[in-house]
Amino acid sequence: MTKKRHLFTSESVTEGHPDKICDQISDSILDAILSKDANARVACETTVTTGLVLVAGEITTSTYVDIPKIVRETIQGIGYTRAKYGFDAETCAVLTSIDEQSADIAMGVDQALEAREGQMTDAEIEAIGAGDQGLMFGFACNETQELMPLPISLAHKLARRLTEVRKNDTLSYLRPDGKTQVTVEYDENGKPVRVDTIVISTQHHPDVTWEEIDRDLKEHVIKAVVPAELIDGETKFFINPTGRFVIGGPQGDAGLTGRKIIVDTYGGYARHGGGAFSGKDATKVDRSAAYAARYVAKNIVAAGLAEKAEVQLAYAIGVAQPVSISVDTFGTGKVSEDVLVELVRNNFDLRPAGIIKMLDLRRPIYKQTAAYGHFGRTDVDLSWERTDKAVALKEQAGL
């Protein structure tokens, strides 16, 4: 059966989107705790609405952090600094409801040995079980330099640029909330050939005209980000297609941590296990194993063993070894998928404590991942984006 040309779409959102405000608050609290207590257990959820922030969850730590202060600093950094936005850092109410981690969960994860970070023997790593059951996916492909699908890569770059031109006053009438969406056309061989559609919706000052926004975003955002060779006379642009976007942020929509899991990962191009990332420390495999799966997939593609690779990991609560590891190369593999699974087992320690050690995940590195994607980032140094295993994988595969 011959393949046909087809379209694929992914979206991103700016850091001022209500759900992303929540992700950033949750990860800012996580970072503040990890900077003082590397072995803390954190599961921190945030919700925002007009004039209100609620932080809830389970935190077990030997340190203290000023949660309302962190919340206000995060909101201020995003740009909600005026009461007329319907939400601002100084006047919003901040409520907290924090408990300790359940003793039943801790029993499956805790070991006194865990405090000896970096000194754990294999037996000690084996003794630390996963904090929950679940399945996680990681993906990589050779469509972009960062080995990510092109639609989500462009959508993130547009969203980041939208924030840049707001914060550097190139377009001072912009306000923090915004969304981007990119549709890419793929040829018969599954290669991206052109951008078919770009959608940008951005919050703005009430006095600016739609014509001005349309002109400025094409000039200062789209042209600055999307390679000219991907845009042609047939490319469609929808800039603020409703015509007006003044009420936004938490005044326009309530926000919640963990509600942008597709934006956070691969834009729908790969499968997703359902677990969110933000506000969770690295003993939560929802986060750490998804990072490890990306690390594995990226190294497989970087090694030239496949053009595309999707890795699935699965865990049982309290058990260290993954209950399953699978690799799908969508017919692009240079070696069989059975061989790839064996290479993965031999080169990556995918037990929870092994992942933490391998990727050095007990550091306060998470707030920077809470907007514009956790994968394919070229603006920050993330351990799971390294391709340091590629040479060994290629050699062991005999290529």
UniProtKB/Swiss-Prot annotation:
Catalytic activity: L-methionine + ATP + H2O = S-adenosyl-L-methionine + phosphate + diphosphate
Pfam families reported in the protein's UniProt record: S-AdoMet_synt_C, S-AdoMet_synt_M, S-AdoMet_synt_N
Region (Flexible loop): 101-111
Pathways involved: Amino-acid biosynthesis; S-adenosyl-L-methionine biosynthesis; S-adenosyl-L-methionine from L-methionine: step 1/1
Gene3D superfamilies the UniProt entry points to: 3.30.300.10
UniProt cofactor(s): Mg(2+); K(+)
Binding site for L-methionine: 58, 101, 253, 284
Membrane spanning stretches: none
Binding-site residues, ATP: 17, 177-179, 244-245, 253, 259-260, 276, 280
Main location: cytoplasm
GO biological process, one term: one-carbon metabolic process
The name this protein goes by in its record: S-adenosylmethionine synthase
Naturally occurring in which organism (per UniProt): Bacillus thuringiensis (strain Al Hakam)
